[in-house]
Structures are given as C-alpha cells and as structure tokens.
C-alpha cells in the first residue's frame, strides 16, 4: 500500500479517536469561555501558522499526506487500506483502530460498485477469515460487512457462495456458546445472502439440516428464495435461537 495513503488512514483514525475523547471530556463538565477566541490554557494561538496539538489529539498531518488526500485516493484504495489496518498483526495497531477501520470499510461497501470490487481487490478471503477471529467484536463486524456487501446484489451473493461463505455464516449463526449479538449479525448476513438467490438458499438449508434444523416446507419441498414470507420464517427461527443463546 502507498506510504502516504497508509499514514493518511492512520491520521484519520487518530483524529476520530481524539474527537471521541474530546466529546466525552466536554460532556463531563469541561469549563467553557465566553471569549470568542481560543480557550485559555490550551496553548493555541490564533495567529500561529502551525498550531500544536496537545494531549491525545492527532499529530499534525504533513504536506505530503495532504497532497495524497487532495490527489484523491480512490475508494478502492481506501478499502484496501482499511483491510490492511483490520488484519494488521502488529501490536502498534490497536483493537480500537481496527474497529474504526471496520466501520469505515462497512460504510464504503454500502456502495454497490464498491461491494462489487471486493473480488477484484482480493478482499473476500481476508473478510471471511475474520468470521473466525478470536475477538467477538471482530467476528461481529465481519458478519456485518458480509451482510452489507451481499444485500440485494446477486454478483456478490455469487462470490460469497463460491468462497464458501454461506456455511461459515450458518455455523456462526447456530454456534453454541457464541454471543447473541454475533449470532444475530450472522443471521442478518445470511438473510442478505439467500434472498432471491436460490443456490445460496439451498446451501444454507443443507448446512442447517446438518446441524439438526430442517428447512423444508410441509410438503417436503425446498424453500423458494424468492418467497420472502418463507425466507422470513427461516431467518426468524435463527433469530429466536440466537435470543436463547
């Protein structure tokens, strides 16, 4: 990944973290001033060409990184950068930063064109591998992103199925000992994966059957992926199982 893009993403994460901390501090009664100028004691000088950031605020972004920003990194580059942060094994990349990057990634793939780029950018494999992550919140966000990527999108539904993602989602949605929030988010992703896409519905039904849950109509026929009422019955059953987890 481009060095400037990587630093820009890190700066963005730092800025968001600092903003969240600042809001929390202000809400707990931080003193205010009626002076329209800089608050006393902050060390900020209105005429300074390079204001210093104090405390836990982000470090000033250098001109090279700004040039990268104004050069317009594509959303595809931002998707790759976010996934690099999410999967970075380095202890320097904190869990909080990974979750922020996950939020950014999910917002990017809300766009249909960006979701379709997951295959071209080779991002399906790392995303699906995160469904098995040891951290509950990482599994939760991974399932969320999968659900966003395949919602009302047959192209990504096909890729998810081809990459073996449907059995993974069924396993996560029905796994004993898994948290309710992860199971419910996996159920959401599975719902998006099977609607109006019969191959995924058939695989999901087969995987659920293996785990002791029959997904057949009263006459023994398969659930029609285009029948939203019947699909809802299957998904509601999984949601109810998650509640009892």
Which stretches of residues belong to each language-model region?
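Alpha-helical solenoid repeats of the armadillo/HEAT superfamily
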Residues: 2-14, 24-28, 34-38, 43-60, ...
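Generic beta-strand or strand-like secondary-structure segments
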Residues: 126-129, 141-148, 168
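Onset and early core of a folded interaction/catalytic domain in large eukaryotic regulators
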Residues: 83-134
């Amino acid at each position: 990944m481009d060095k400037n893009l990587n630093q820009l993403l890190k700066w963005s994460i730092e800025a968001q973290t600092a903003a969240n901390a600042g809001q929390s501090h202000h809400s707990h009664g931080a003193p205010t001033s009626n002076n329209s100028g800089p608050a006393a004691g902050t060390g900020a000088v209105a005429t300074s060409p390079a204001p210093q950031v104090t405390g836990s605020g982000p470090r000033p972004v250098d001109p090279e990184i700004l040039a990268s920003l104004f050069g317009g990194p594509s959303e595809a580059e931002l998707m790759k950068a976010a996934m690099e942060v999410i999967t970075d094994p380095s202890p320097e990349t904190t869990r909080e930063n990974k979750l922020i990057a996950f939020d950014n990634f999910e917002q990017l793939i809300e766009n249909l064109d960006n979701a379709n780029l997951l295959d071209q950018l080779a991002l399906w494999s790392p995303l699906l591998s995160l469904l098995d992550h040891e951290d509950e919140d990482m599994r939760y966000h991974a399932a969320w992103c999968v659900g966003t990527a395949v919602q009302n999108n047959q192209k990504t539904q096909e890729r998810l199925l081809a990459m073996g993602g449907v059995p993974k989602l069924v396993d996560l949605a029905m796994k004993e000992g898994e948290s309710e929030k992860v199971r419910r988010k996996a159920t959401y992703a599975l719902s998006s994966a099977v609607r109006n896409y019969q191959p995924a519905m058939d695989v999901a039904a087969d995987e659920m059957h293996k785990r002791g849950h029959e997904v057949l109509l009263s006459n023994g026929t398969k659930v029609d992926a285009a029948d939203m009422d019947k699909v809802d019955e299957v998904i509601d059953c999984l949601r109810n199982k998650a509640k009892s987890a």
